[in-house]
């Protein structure tokens, strides 16, 4: 059974409220939280997918020094995608080649299983035309092609330029 690598966390954040939002501070905080969706934040060990249950921890926001912005502590529940090495995930195959299998996790995150992490006895079947992709045939006769779901084990995580790439393995399948 695959993990989803989804976790709920409750976090306290110190956020600003622009002068134009001073009459509706909840809207200001929601805008802050919206901008954090699909971002990896230092205080949250993973990528924020959703948030809920915003609570103000102070009765009023504070204006700091000569800033036009006010600041307030809030507590928010966040849904976080945080895969770890060894997690079992499921992805939808979107690319099949002799060098790797590409997948989408949750329809959002890219994953790649390189040839060295595909069982040695699996066979790559070349495409019939240049417009098709190939297919992998497993040792029990199953055909893996774009659109099919595939379980794999997380072998590593790469984060570059704000993007997360999951590296997987099937070697123990």
Swiss-Prot record:
Keywords: DNA-directed RNA polymerase, Nucleus, Phosphoprotein, Transcription. One of its GO terms (biological process) is transcription elongation by RNA polymerase I. It holds the Pfam family RPA43_OB. InterPro entries: RNA_pol_Rpb7-like_N_sf, RPA43_OB, Rpb7-like, Rpb7-like_N. Contains an average of four phosphates per molecule. It is found in: Nucleus, Nucleolus. One of its GO terms (cellular component) is RNA polymerase I complex. DNA-dependent RNA polymerase catalyzes the transcription of DNA into RNA using the four ribonucleoside triphosphates as substrates. Component of RNA polymerase I which synthesizes ribosomal RNA precursors. May be involved in recruitment of Pol I to rDNA promoters. Belongs to the eukaryotic RPA43 RNA polymerase subunit family. Component of the RNA polymerase I (Pol I) complex consisting of 14 subunits. Part of a Pol I subcomplex consisting of the subunits A14 and A43. Interacts with ker1/A14. This is DNA-directed RNA polymerase I subunit rpa43. It comes from Schizosaccharomyces pombe (strain 972 / ATCC 24843). The gene is rpa43.
């Amino acid at each position: 059974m695959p993990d989803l690598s989804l976790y709920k966390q409750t976090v306290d954040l110190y956020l600003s409220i622009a002068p134009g939002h001073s009459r509706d501070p909840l809207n200001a905080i929601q805008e802050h939280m919206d901008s954090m969706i699909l971002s990896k934040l230092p205080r949250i060990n993973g990528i924020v997918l959703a948030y809920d249950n915003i609570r103000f921890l102070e009765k009023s926001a504070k204006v700091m020094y000569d800033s036009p912005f006010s600041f307030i502590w809030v507590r928010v529940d966040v849904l976080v995608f945080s895969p770890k090495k060894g997690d079992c995930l499921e992805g939808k195959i979107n690319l099949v080649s002799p060098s790797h299998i590409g997948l989408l996790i949750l329809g959002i995150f890219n994953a790649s299983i390189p040839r060295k992490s595909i069982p040695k006895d699996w066979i790559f079947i070349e495409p019939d035309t240049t417009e098709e992709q190939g297919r992998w045939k497993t040792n029990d006769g199953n055909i893996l092609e774009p659109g099919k779901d595939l379980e794999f084990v997380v072998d590593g995580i790469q984060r570059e330029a704000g993007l997360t790439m999951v590296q997987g393995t099937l070697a123990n399948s």
